[in-house]
C-alpha cells in the first residue's frame, strides 16, 4: 500500500516529478493541480482568477482535498498538489516538498503556459501568496512550515532527470527499509 505525496511551490516541478514517480512505482497519480486547472477551464477562468474565486468559495479546496485524502487512504497512489502532503500525511510513506527560486519557476511557467516571463513571475508570486493565505484561513496550515516533509528538494538547478532520480532514490530506500522488501 505505497503512498507518496508530492507538494511544493507553483512551477517547482511537482506534477512532472510526481508523474514520473507514479510511472516507476506503477501506481496511479492523483493531481490536485490538474483537477484545479480543469475546474478553472470549465469555469472559463485563468489560474489566478480561479485562485481568487476559490478564496471566497472554500468548497472547491475542500472537495479537491477530500478526494486526495480518500485516494491516499486507499493506498497505492502518488498524490500531488500544494496541500497533498498535509492531506495525505496520515497515510503517506513519503512526503516530498519541491521548491525553486521565483525566477526559475517563472521561467518554467512561461515556457509551459506560453506567456511572458514578467507575466509568469507575477502569476507565480501571486498564486503562492493566494495559496498561503487561503490554506492558513481554511485549514490553519502554514505552507512555509516544512516540518512534515521527509525530503525537501530545491529543483532550481536540477534537470528533470536529476530531480526524479534523487526523489526516487529517497523513496525507494525509505520503502525498502519500511517494508523490508524491494519495492522499486
From Swiss-Prot:
What family does the database annotate?
Belongs to the cytidylate kinase family. Type 2 subfamily.
GO molecular function per UniProt: ATP binding; CMP kinase activity; dCMP kinase activity
Q: Which organism is it from?
A: Pyrobaculum neutrophilum (strain DSM 2338 / JCM 9278 / NBRC 100436 / V24Sta)
Q: Which InterPro entries match?
A: Cyt_kin_arch, Cytidylate_kinase_dom, P-loop_NTPase
Chief place of localization: cytoplasm
Superkingdom: Archaea
Q: Which UniProt keywords apply?
A: ATP-binding, Cytoplasm, Kinase, Nucleotide-binding, Transferase
Q: Which GO terms are recorded in the biological process aspect for this UniProt protein?
A: pyrimidine nucleotide metabolic process
**Can you tell me which residues bind ATP?**
8-16
The protein's annotated catalytic reaction(s) are: CMP + ATP = CDP + ADP; dCMP + ATP = dCDP + ADP
Gene symbol of the encoding locus: cmk
Q: What is this protein called?
A: Cytidylate kinase
